[in-house]
Structure formats: structure tokens, C-alpha cells
Amino acid sequence: NKRKRFVLFYFPYTQSLFGKHGGQDFDQSFKYKYAFSIWPERKNYFREVHSAIAELAVENPDIDFVIKPKSIMMKGESWEYYEQVLNEISFDINKVDNYSIEPDIDVHGLILDSDVFCALQSSTAIEAAISGKPVILPIFENYRSTENYQDFAWKNYLDIFDVANNAQHFKDLIIKLKNCHTVSSHILN
């Protein structure tokens, strides 16, 4: 019996989806000025996503949890904060056999061999969905209520994903979908 596998296509909290620095010189009528406003809750959101995954790894030793960052993402303030979050919740990667960080793993093989995916604005979200696999978008209500959400690439296609409204809903979806081998037919059509 094959072990279930959950994959997070890692995204940094510093990505422009949550706002970017600069733009103070724009005229107040500039249509996209919100994009230069940093979402103040982005670090809390990031903490909630990663804490939920770590908790599930401890609670569900029968599921493998894979964090798939690009190698370049493992440098800088967002990755340092990721490590800080795990440290603050006393999550030791070396003591949990079913949690791994795999920057060099083949993405296409990972998609074919895994059961449930999580991503944000990555093309891998679409690739996994096209492969008939369930994909969770952790776009919690507190993010969806921001102006920055206007720039979320998949916002007009939420019906092809499972959308988590908050951290508990995110955890519930992961557990529910681990036994779901394909996406429902209404999503594929």
C-alpha cells in the first residue's frame, strides 16, 4: 500500500503577490498603487501555513509531507523566517521522518507520484490540476479581503481548486483530500 504524499510548492512571504517596496512617488490616482503596499499580515499568514503543515506531519505519520522550494528560495529573509517558524513551534525536521525539504526533486515526477498539492501562484498548481490531482490554494479570507488579492493569478479560476479559508480549513482539506485520488469531474470539465 503506497504512502500518501502531500506537497507544498514553497512560496516566500516576500513575493510581490503580498505587495512590494517602492512606488511612493506615484500619483494618488495611479490604479495599481496598492501593489506597492506590503500586506502587514503576510508573515502571520506564512506562519499559519507552515505551522499547519508541521502539525499535520506530527499528527499523521502515515502521510509524507514534502516542501518543494526552488533552490534560490532557500536563501534570504523568507527562508530564514521559515526556519525561525519551525524553531519557534519546536518542530525539528530531523526528528520527523515524514517531513522533508526537496529542492532538487523532479517536479513532474513529484506531481505524478503525489496525492495532494498546495501552491499559490505557481504554474505547478495548474500542472498538478491538469494531472487530475487535488490542489489546495491557501488563500485565506484575510488575504482575499486585501487589495493585493487583485493580482492573484488564479483568482478567476478558483473553481478548479480547493480553496482554504483559514488554517484549520487548510488542515481539514489536506486530510480530506489524502483519500481522494482524482479531482471531481465538475472541476475537470
Predicted regions and their residues:
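Short, well-ordered coil/turn elements that cap or connect secondary structure elements
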Residues: K2, N60, I93-V96, I130, ...
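Residues at the C-termini of beta-strands that transition into short coil/loop
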Residues: F11, P69, I105, I139, ...
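Hydrophobic/aromatic beta-strand patches that form the interior of the parallel beta-sheet core
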Residues: V66, S100, V116-C118, I136-P138, ...
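Donor nucleotide-activated moiety binding/catalytic core segment of transferases
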Residues: I72-S131
